[in-house]
């Protein structure tokens, strides 16, 4: 069973803005990443009854491991 997840953007003033609803956590995380790449900012995925299940931290920098 796929759940429906809401994607929100955290605004600079601390408020939240609902963006969209998508089906499935994988799709929600993917969409959240695309939104952040296009418009920047902090986003999170919310599942009713569970709360925030994923967040995108704009200050996180991916570092590739060097072998």
Task: Give the positions of each predicted feature.
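A short, charged, amphipathic alpha-helix used as a generic interaction element across diverse proteins
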Residues: 22-46
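Short, mixed-charge low-complexity intrinsically disordered segments
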Residues: 37-67
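Surface-exposed loop/edge segments in extracytoplasmic proteins
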Residues: 14-20, 52-54
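Short aromatic-glycine-(Arg/Gly/Cys) micro-motifs in beta-strand/loop hairpins
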Residues: 1-17
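General helical structural elements
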Residues: 13-14, 33-35, 67
């Amino acid at each position: 069973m796929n759940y429906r997840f809401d994607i929100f953007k955290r605004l600079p003033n601390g408020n939240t803005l609902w963006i969209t609803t998508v089906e499935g956590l994988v799709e929600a995380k993917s969409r959240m990443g695309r939104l952040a790449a296009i418009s920047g900012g902090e986003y999170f995925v919310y599942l009713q009854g569970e709360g925030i299940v994923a967040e995108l931290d704009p200050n996180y920098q991916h570092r590739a491991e060097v072998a």
